[in-house]
Regions:
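DNA strand-break repair and replication-stress modules
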Residues: 1-80
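Preference for intrinsically disordered or flexible, low-complexity segments
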Residues: 79-364
């Protein structure tokens, strides 16, 4: 097994995510040693010490993009082009066309476990929510207790921190609250019923207007970390507080979406390839089919195409408001490695109307 070491910041994933991908086929080292086979320079402006040492040792130095191509080439050896109606080469053409002509812009959310409590107005998973002094805090009715309980914060998105996306707000604070429940508050019978979960939007907010953590605690408000510490039976998809960063991405339709086969046929027609009426499972071999999911990294996301474990639960015309994936190494897990997503219509999003949001959670 060849050894590899990385230097510089990756443009579209964390070092941890890149390492996880590489470990499937390489021995990953943290320093440049004499027996190192490959040094991947993820950032051309990265420090020169590792580069100089690698060149001195005769280590092969490649770019981040070249390394990803190496991973793809290794995968190609395991493909059977005869498995599907489309060959592997044709499948790659179709995937590229889907991204080029039919891709949807979104914002990928990267998580970092917070070392200390984050500012009240910051984008975050978990932690304490922003809440304006004097405003009534949202509660839910608990089957276990006589009195209503304060919601806990699942996610808070400060849209001033999010890359601009068509029809999405460029400012304002979105909050998603949840309750301790085996379905994380979701209602299978009515996915828009905000009884055990809640969406709250703030147009005008600031640190100066925010209640302090002490004031929130006095009202009975807890972070998810505190709720888990106080109740061993509490169930939430996250275990900690997470700082968030955002980057714009282009997503493509995946086989779990109702529109996938329609987009594949459009792409095939554009490329002058045969257009099949068979299902996606027949059109593509197993490996090619799975490649459309692009699921090598956690898909926490705003906008773009959603991801489902079981099947498309969105309504026709819905946009993805927010999606939280499972990220086991960081203590984020929806059931059995599932995903939670929230949808609304384009018109409701433009009007900042969050009363008809659809909440779905599923897992394998």
């Amino acid at each position: 097994m060849e050894s590899v070491c990385f230097t510089g910041a990756c443009p579209d994933m964390t070092r941890e995510e890149l390492t996880e991908m590489a470990e499937e086929k390489f021995e990953v080292k943290t320093s440049v040693t004499k027996d190192l086979d490959i040094l991947v320079c993820a950032d051309p402006n990265a420090g020169s010490s590792k580069l100089e040492k690698a060149k001195k040792n005769g280590t092969k130095v490649i770019s981040y993009e070249e390394f990803l191509e190496m991973l793809d080439e290794d995968d190609d050896e395991n493909y059977d082009d005869e498995e599907g109606l489309y060959t592997h080469a044709q499948a790659k053409q179709i995937m590229a066309r889907l991204r080029e002509a039919y891709g949807l812009e979104g914002a990928r959310i990267k998580t970092t476990i917070a070392k200390k409590s984050l500012p009240m107005t910051a984008s975050k998973f978990g932690g304490y929510p922003y809440w304006e002094k004097g405003a009534e805090y949202p509660h839910y009715d608990s089957e276990d207790e006589d009195e209503a309980k304060p919601f806990v914060l699942l996610a808070q998105i400060n849209f001033a921190e999010v890359p601009p996306l068509p029809d999405y707000p460029t400012k304002g604070l979105l909050q998603i609250f949840t309750s301790s429940d085996d379905l994380y508050g979701m209602d299978y019978e009515d996915a828009t019923k905000q009884e055990l979960w809640r969406i709250v939007w703030h147009d005008d907010f600031s640190e100066e207007k925010a209640m302090s953590k002490r004031e929130l605690r006095a009202m009975g408000v807890k972070s998810i970390v505190e709720a888990l510490e106080e109740d061993n039976d509490a169930l939430f998809p996250i275990e900690k507080e997470y700082a968030l960063s955002f980057e714009k991405i282009v997503t493509i339709a995946n086989p779990r979406l109702n529109v996938f086969e329609e987009y594949v046929r459009k792409a095939a027609k554009d490329l002058g390839l045969p257009v099949y009426e068979e299902s996606a499972l027949e059109m593509f071999g197993e490996n090619d089919y799975n490649n459309f999911f692009e699921s090598k990294i956690a898909q926490h996301q705003i906008g773009g195409f959603p991801f489902f474990c079981q099947g498309d639960q969105s309504r026709e015309g819905d946009l993805l408001l927010f999606q939280m994936d499972s990220e086991m190494k960081k203590g984020i897990c929806w059931g059995d490695l599932g995903v939670g997503n929230f949808f609304l219509s384009r018109e409701d999003l433009k009007n900042l109307n969050f009363t008809n949001v659809l909440y779905n959670y599923d897992c394998d």
